[in-house]
């Protein structure tokens, strides 16, 4: 039964990715099956979080003219009409624009006695019997929390500390110097050893037993209460459970069910110290002390005013205290409405009854956040829809270079500056460039998924060095040693005494230089930093002979590593190969049984693993047909299928920042929180092959013989662009390319100067590269903050419109998308990822403490998977305060993703019908979809699940949202 309950509530656990591959996500992803407004209402209650900004935030935008008066009035009137109170329009407008932000100040006694009808109205809402109050108050609490409130204890803190200490140690990915033993047995198996539990029960049986002993009335809700207590850790465990190929999940498996069993164990363990140890006993105790229990819970939840707490401590009658408290609440709420009515209503009559007015104000307080939000969105939609609809296509000739960037909002400025410098045009595409790969970097031993989190790549690509790299190895080893030393300094209480003395000068450069003298330090570190050798990729598919050879070599190296780790011995290739063949052929004669057991079980040296590795290696690289299709799909995706210029520049992006656990959040979201350089190097290499171009001609795409594809990387922190693999370029083209490089450097500088104006304390654009290595810098760049929309269409439709680095820009030419395949791919990929990014920024802004990550200043890295605040606590989900706020003022403007698609309406609808996940987001209004149909001169939007005309430029431009 426990597993069934768990399956029902797991959707309420937010998404989470480890910080090394940070993926932006909607923390309310589990609510997306519901309409946006209803989902926010439920989530606010469940997470105890704010889901809209405070009224004064929106009022300020209204005063600044950002929220348009006519749009606010229209949305307000529609709401009032829906509840039959449109006669209060003038009063309602004044309430939300002038009074609501001071709501709490109206809850005071005044000279005007509240109307008796108001007293009755609030009496019915506030005064409840003790049984009802008790059940409402404990609904979201664990039993230990309830008892802490009643007995004024802190046992829950002790329980949580025990839970978190175990969980952080079990889930550790190499941070601690003392690894927990027996983790390969799984979380619950390791926990039984950790706690010395003598039980044969599995995690489900164990959790079921404890829940039976606790006997909560609503078992499903009680399980959810436990998981939401530390929902960051629950989210990470959910991530691991959902990603079975995650390396640490394979070697140290964990599940939400095991985590629940651990949590319940500690709660039950400490409840044994109480006279009450289950809900049956709690109910019996409540029957004897109903009023006192209710008061203690009100106090624990910070609801009971201090004067009543004083009376409680003075042993006043609990019944008198509760009666007085509820009575005062009734009168104060009545006074509040009376005070507001005195300001808004000149006289009361039958049409404007005071209880109707109270109901109106109650509904306005419930709805005002959404009214303001929609009005803000509609104001932007009106502005941009008319601009996009009326923009004219510019025909550019004699293009020297087409630069393809990620759709990321941070690409908009540099694209704009490049286009202004000469014969350049730019395109936007998801940053993995249509090349999803599992990438194994040179000098690294693990895969990186360089593709959106929605995709599991089918192709594996290895990076291999092309030449000698002794200098790289030497410098890399120095840097690696220093990095490990620094980790020891953070994580080991003893080794720093020895290491700092031995390497003091090197620590001085980092610990002080990066904080006090970042400019000078940047020069030193650029000299020390290991320069990666020239590398190539395993682009072509391996033959069967190659697969056999590499698989065998891999296992031989595993055997050598095992001997080194387990027995401190070195064995040569021949001996390791003989041992490997003996194990695979099951000829164990003469092999020490202990060695055989270790190799087979701990290191998976067996026939089954060998065959699996060969299957895995069969996924390395692409066939020629696959390579042709890869380039064809890419060129069609961006609409570059004819008039292909001399240079096609494929520019991925990444970021650089030091002392920043959230660094991967600044990298490419479409590459799983990594940078996309390998993707563009692979794609460019394939596109430059003659046989691939011949294959493309057969599908109608002619790439001129002298066209060169050059890969590059855009560092979004410094706005520098670096090109790679330029040796493929003939000498005769060097001068032209040098001009491009020079122009791009100018564009980079102009972009830095533009960004410096928005970055606090940045000074000039020249200072921006220094911020990337400054350890005291909590905000190396704004990242994706202020994102507001995505434009799917031609660059000519946006080129002359001020997008202010707030739009994702996906190139799309609907005329060549005959079967809707391209649009469906956009809707199933960039569209959904864009919503994740947008919603994470939205909720990290509305409630940074609950749905964001809090301030970076107090963060500490834990287990190499995330951060917590202070010395222990929950894993922080969402984005840090410094990403979305500055000096207490929101920098990010939380609105839903405004998605503009330039295509005929019927084409968009047809594609959306086939992408159910995207359709759900549109119909449930998690995004705002606007269709720009330039053929008809009409823009459409969705309203209440139906398509409606938004602007019709054939007649009078009328905005009908």
Curated annotation (Swiss-Prot):
Instruction: Give an example GO molecular function.
Output: zinc ion binding
Write out the GO cellular component annotations. plasma membrane
- Which residues are recorded as binding Zn(2+)? 406, 408, 653, 668
Per UniProt, what is one Pfam family of this protein? DabA
Origin superkingdom: Bacteria
Cofactors: Zn(2+)
Tell where it localizes: Cell inner membrane
Keyword Transport listed? The answer is yes
Which keywords has UniProt assigned to this entry? Cell inner membrane, Cell membrane, Membrane, Metal-binding, Transport, Zinc
Q: What does this protein do?
A: Part of an energy-coupled inorganic carbon pump.
Q: Which family does it belong to?
A: Belongs to the inorganic carbon transporter (TC 9.A.2) DabA family.
Protein name as catalogued: Probable inorganic carbon transporter subunit DabA
Could you tell me which species this protein originates from?
A: Hydrogenobaculum sp. (strain Y04AAS1)
Give the gene that encodes this protein: dabA
């Amino acid at each position: 039964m426990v597993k069934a309950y768990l399956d029902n509530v797991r959707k309420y656990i937010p998404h989470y990715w480890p910080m090394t591959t940070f993926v932006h996500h909607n923390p309310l992803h589990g609510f997306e099956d519901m309409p946006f407004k209803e989902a926010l209402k439920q989530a606010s209650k469940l997470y105890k979080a704010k889901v809209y900004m405070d009224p004064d935030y929106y009022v300020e935008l209204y005063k600044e003219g950002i929220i348009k008066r006519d749009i606010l009035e229209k949305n307000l009137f529609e709401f009032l009409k829906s509840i039959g109170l449109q006669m209060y329009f003038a009063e309602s407008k004044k309430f939300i624009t002038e009074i609501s932000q001071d709501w709490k100040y109206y809850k005071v006694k005044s000279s005007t006695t509240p109307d008796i009808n108001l007293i009755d109205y609030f009496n019915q809402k506030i005064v409840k019997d003790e049984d009802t109050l008790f059940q409402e108050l404990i609904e979201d609490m664990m039993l230990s929390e309830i008892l802490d409130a009643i007995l004024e204890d802190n046992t829950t803190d002790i329980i949580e500390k025990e839970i978190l200490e175990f969980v952080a140690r079990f889930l550790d990915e190499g941070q601690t110097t003392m690894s927990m033993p027996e983790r390969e047995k799984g979380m619950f198996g390791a926990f039984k050893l950790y706690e010395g539990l003598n039980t044969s029960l599995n995690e489900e049986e164990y959790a079921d037993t404890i829940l039976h002993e606790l006997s909560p009335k609503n078992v499903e809700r009680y399980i959810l209460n436990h998981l939401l207590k530390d929902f960051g850790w629950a989210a990470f465990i959910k991530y691991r459970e959902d990603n079975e190929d995650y390396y640490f999940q394979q070697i140290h498996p964990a599940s939400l069910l095991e985590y629940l069993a651990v949590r319940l164990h500690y709660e039950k363990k400490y409840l044994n110290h109480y006279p009450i140890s289950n809900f049956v006993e709690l109910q019996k105790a409540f029957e004897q002390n109903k009023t006192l229990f209710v008061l203690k819970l009100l106090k624990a939840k910070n609801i009971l005013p201090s004067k009543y707490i004083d009376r409680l401590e003075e042993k006043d009658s609990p019944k008198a205290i509760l009666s007085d408290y509820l009575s005062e609440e009734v009168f104060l709420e009545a006074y509040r409405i009376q005070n507001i009515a005195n300001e808004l209503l000149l006289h009361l009559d039958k049409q404007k009854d005071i209880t109707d007015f109270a109901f109106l104000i109650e509904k306005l307080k419930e709805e005002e956040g959404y009214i303001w939000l929609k009005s803000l969105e509609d104001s932007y939609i009106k502005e941009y829809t008319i601009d996009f609809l009326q923009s004219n296509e510019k025909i550019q000739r004699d293009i020297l270079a087409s630069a393809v960037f990620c759709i990321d909002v941070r690409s908009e400025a540099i694209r704009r500056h490049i286009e202004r410098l000469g014969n350049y045009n730019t395109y936007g595409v998801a940053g993995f460039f249509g090349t999803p790969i599992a990438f194994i970097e040179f000098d690294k031993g693990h895969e990186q998924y360089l593709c959106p989190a929605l995709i599991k790549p089918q192709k594996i690509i290895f990076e291999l060095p092309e030449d000698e790299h002794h200098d790289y190895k030497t410098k890399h080893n120095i840097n690696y040693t220093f990095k490990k030393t620094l980790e020891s300094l953070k994580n080991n209480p003893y080794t720093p005494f020895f290491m700092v003395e031995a390497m003091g000068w090197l620590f001085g450069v980092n610990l002080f230089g990066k904080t006090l003298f970042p400019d000078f330090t940047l020069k030193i570190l650029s000299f020390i930093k290991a320069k990666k050798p020239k590398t190539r990729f395993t682009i072509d598919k391996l033959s069967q002979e190659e697969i056999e050879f590499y698989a065998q070599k891999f296992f031989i190296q595993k055997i050598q590593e095992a001997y080194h780790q387990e027995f401190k011995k070195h064995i040569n290739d021949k001996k390791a190969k003989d041992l490997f063949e003996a194990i695979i052929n099951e000829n164990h004669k003469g092999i020490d049984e202990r060695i055989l057991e270790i190799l087979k079980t701990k290191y998976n040296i067996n026939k089954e693993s060998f065959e699996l590795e060969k299957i895995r290696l069969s996924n390395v690289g692409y066939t020629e047909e696959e390579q042709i299709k890869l380039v064809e799909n890419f060129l069609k995706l961006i609409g570059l299928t004819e008039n292909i210029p001399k240079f096609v520049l494929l520019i991925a992006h990444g970021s650089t920042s030091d002392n920043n656990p959230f660094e991967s959040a600044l990298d490419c979201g479409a590459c799983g929180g990594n940078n996309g350089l390998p993707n563009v190097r692979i794609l460019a290499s394939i596109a430059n092959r003659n046989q691939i171009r011949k294959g493309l001609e057969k599908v109608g795409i002619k790439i001129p013989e002298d066209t060169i594809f050059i890969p590059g990387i855009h560092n979004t922190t410094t706005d520098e662009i670096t090109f790679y693999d330029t040796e493929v370029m003939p000498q005769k083209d060097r001068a032209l390319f040098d001009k491009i490089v020079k122009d791009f450097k100018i564009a980079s500088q102009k972009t830095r100067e533009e960004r410096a104006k928005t970055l606090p304390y940045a000074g000039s654009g020249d200072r921006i590269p220094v911020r990337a290595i400054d350890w005291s810098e909590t905000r190396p760049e704004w990242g994706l903050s202020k994102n507001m929309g995505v434009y799917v269409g031609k660059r000519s439709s946006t080129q002359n419109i001020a997008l202010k680095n707030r739009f994702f820009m996906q190139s799309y030419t609907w005329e060549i998308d005959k079967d809707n395949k391209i649009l469906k791919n956009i809707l199933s990929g960039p569209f959904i990822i864009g919503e994740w990014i947008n919603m994470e920024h939205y909720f990290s802004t509305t409630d940074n403490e609950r749905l964001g990550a809090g301030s970076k200043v107090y963060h500490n890295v834990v287990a190499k998977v995330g951060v917590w605040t202070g010395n222990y606590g929950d894993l922080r989900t969402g984005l840090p305060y410094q990403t979305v706020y500055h000096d207490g003022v929101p920098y990010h403007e939380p609105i839903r993703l405004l998605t503009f698609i330039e295509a005929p309406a019927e084409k968009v609808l047809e594609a959306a019908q086939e992408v159910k996940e995207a359709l759900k987001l549109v119909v449930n209004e998690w995004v705002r979809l606007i269709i720009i149909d330039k053929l008809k001169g009409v823009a459409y939007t969705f309203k209440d699940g139906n398509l409606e005309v938004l602007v019709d430029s054939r007649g009078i431009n009328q905005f009908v949202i």
